[in-house]
Amino acid sequence: MNHNQMNMHVPMNQVAGAPNVAMQMPVPGPIMQQQSPQQMQPAPVPQQTQQDKMDNISKVKSLMGSLRESIPMTLKSAAQILHQNHNADSNTQKGMDNPVPRFEKNLEEFFSICDQMELHLRTATTCIQQAQSAAHYLPLSVIASRLDSGPTTQETTLSYPQYLKTVGLQISYAKDIHDTLVAAAQNISPPE
């Protein structure tokens, strides 16, 4: 089965446990069951490599499972609150014995996951843009070693200290151009 397809055939659970209520909600397996806050914590992840820890796209992919669990929980708690309010308004419910999960808490968790995903995606976008700019303005590859291992004989690579020196020269060159343009603009403008 393709992971992008969702199973549309799901069992139905009754809302708020009331057997005489005709309103039913789809429940995809154990995700929709009430869980205590301790059970909602993600299981400990096995030790990942250093590359996986720094990869923002991997972090977004790992948050997708939490997001898929959070959406139904948020919608279920909202539906239960609406159903409970409807029963209270129509006086069909004797008492408020069934505790309703906190909608605000579920909604906050959902938005928290969305914010984390947005942060990781923006960071990944920024990293890609910086890599493209670096490749455009400095088409040489940089050796990741921080120590200068002497002059490089290859014309297509730079050591890290050479890279830092090149970047420093580019920054000072851009600053000199900026200062020259500011001075020229001041010379052109009439004195007040």
UniProtKB/Swiss-Prot annotation:
Major subcellular site: nucleus
Q: Which cysteines are joined by disulfide bonds?
A: none
A single Gene Ontology biological process assigned to it is: regulation of transcription by RNA polymerase II
Q: Where is this region: Disordered?
A: 32-51
A single Gene Ontology molecular function, please? transcription coregulator activity
Keywords of the record: Activator, Nucleus, Transcription, Transcription regulation
Q: Which GO terms describe its cellular component?
A: mediator complex
Q: Does the keyword Transcription regulation apply?
A: yes
Where in the cell does this protein reside?
A: Nucleus
Family matches, as Pfam families? Med29 (PF11568)
Physiological role: Component of the Mediator complex, a coactivator involved in the regulated transcription of nearly all RNA polymerase II-dependent genes. Mediator functions as a bridge to convey information from gene-specific regulatory proteins to the basal RNA polymerase II transcription machinery. Mediator is recruited to promoters by direct interactions with regulatory proteins and serves as a scaffold for the assembly of a functional preinitiation complex with RNA polymerase II and the general transcription factors.
For this protein, the record's PANTHER family field holds: MEDIATOR OF RNA POLYMERASE II TRANSCRIPTION SUBUNIT 29
Subunit structure of this chain's protein:
Component of the Mediator complex.
Give the similarity note.
Belongs to the Mediator complex subunit 29 family.
Q: What is this protein called?
A: Mediator of RNA polymerase II transcription subunit 29
Which species expresses this protein natively?
Bombyx mori (Silk moth)
- Gene for this chain: ix
